[in-house]
Amino acid sequence: MSLVIRNLQRVIPIRRAPLRSKIEIVRRILGVQKFDLGIICVDNKNIQHINRIYRDRNVPTDVLSFPFHEHLKAGEFPQPDFPDDYNLGDIFLGVEYIFHQCKENEDYNDVLTVTATHGLCHLLGFTHGTEAEWQQMFQKEKAVLDELGRRTGTRLQPLTRGLFGGS
C-alpha cells in the first residue's frame, strides 16, 4: 500500500526520496508494507502545538505517532476487516527539533530514518514508559535497524538507546 511523506515546513530541507527508500525497506522488514502510512514533517511550532493538544506537553519533540489501530500489544499486527482498515496511522516528525538535536558527526537524514522507525514501532504497539517496555522496544528497533544496515550499508542505532541507562 502507499507511503505518503508530506513536508509541511520550510525551516529544514528534507530529502524525501532517500527517506522514502529507507522507510519502504523498514516497512518490509517489519512486514507491514501492505498497510498505508503517513509521515508528516513539521517545524517546532507545529510539533509543539500537536504535543500540547494530544500529550498535554507544551514543548517541541522529535516524533509523535497516531495509530489507526489503537490498543495493539507490542509487535502485534493489525487484523483489518475491511480494505480501508489497511492503515497503520500517521507519524509526525519534528524535523526542526531533530535537526537541532543531532550530535556532531551524526547524519541528519540517518537520524530522520531512525526517528521514523521509532514512530513506526509506536504504531505497532511498542512503548517505553517502563524499563521492561523500553527493553522490548529497544530490541525491536535494534533488530530492524541492524537489518536495514545489512540491506543498505548504514549503521544506525535505536532512538531509545540510553533511555533507562542502556547503551
UniProtKB/Swiss-Prot annotation:
It is an enzyme of class 3 (hydrolase). Its EC number is 3.1.-.-. The keyword Protease does not apply. It is found in: Nucleus. InterPro entries: MetalPrtase_cat_dom_sf_prd, YbeY, YbeY_CS. The keyword Nucleus applies. Zn(2+) binds at residues 118, 122, 128. Its main location: nucleus. Keywords: Endonuclease, Hydrolase, Metal-binding, Nuclease, Nucleus, Zinc. A protein of the expected size has been detected by antibody binding and Western blot in at least one of the analyzed tissues or cells. Belongs to the endoribonuclease YbeY family. Single strand-specific metallo-endoribonuclease involved in rRNA maturation. This is Endoribonuclease YbeY.
